[in-house]
Regions:
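C-terminal helical "lid" subdomain and adjoining coupling/linker elements of P-loop NTPases
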Residues: 1-4, 11-30, 126-134
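AAA+ P-loop ATPase catalytic core
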Residues: 1-12, 94, 112-116
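Intrinsically disordered, low-complexity segments enriched in polar/charged residues with Gly/Pro
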Residues: 8, 17-18, 43, 101
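Soluble catalytic regions of large protease machineries
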Residues: 29-33, 39-178
Length: 178
């Protein structure tokens, strides 16, 4: 049934809900506005919505809540506009906190990681950089996952290119935040 499918979707997507976790009223309020920020942008921006589930119940992965879009099926190709809107949605929680409370919390740390990852992939993997062009700056072994993977590892590009990549990633994230 739909309820079982939703529970499975939540467990896979956010590690399940941690209902035993005691949350203060203040933290619950912050989480509610934070998740509302994501939900509003999912609703307003093309390619990324619509919203399927919004929850302020803490997750097994440590998040205070979550906002999940309705699954759009298997997508073979994702456009630059879609990735930019994913970055914007990931910033929605922090923006909502700033608007409502005049400040923001550490609650957006995973959102920041996601936004940075999307922007870096756009520049280094997908050739979507205006300044660095249609070039892949990732080496095949960058996808290896093991402790110490960077020991003795050299990048397949110069320090000048590394600085340009960092600058381009920052520029994409900054433009999406505005």
């Amino acid at each position: 049934n739909k309820e079982d499918v939703d529970k499975s979707y939540i467990k896979v997507g956010v590690g399940g809900e941690k209902r035993s976790h005691v949350v203060s009223e203040e933290d619950r309020k912050i989480t509610a506005y934070h998740e509302s920020g994501h939900a509003i942008l999912f609703h307003l921006l093309p390619y990324v919505g619509p919203v399927h589930i919004v929850s302020i119940i803490p997750t097994g992965t440590g998040a205070g809540g979550y906002t999940m879009p309705l699954p759009q099926g298997d997508q073979e190709y994702i456009t630059k506009a879609h990735l930019l809107n994913e970055i914007k949605v990931s910033m929605g929680g922090r923006i909502a906190e700033k608007i409502i409370f005049g400040n923001f919390t550490t609650g957006a740390s995973q959102d920041i990681k996601m936004a940075s990852g999307y922007a870096r992939s756009m520049v280094t993997k997908y050739g979507m950089s205006e300044n660095l062009g249609f070039i892949n700056y990732e080496s095949d072994d960058q996808e290896e996952v093991f402790l110490g993977k960077n020991l003795g590892h050299t990048k397949p590009y110069s320090e000048k290119i590394a600085a340009a990549i960092d600058e381009e990633v920052k520029q994409i994230v900054d433009e999406c935040y505005r």
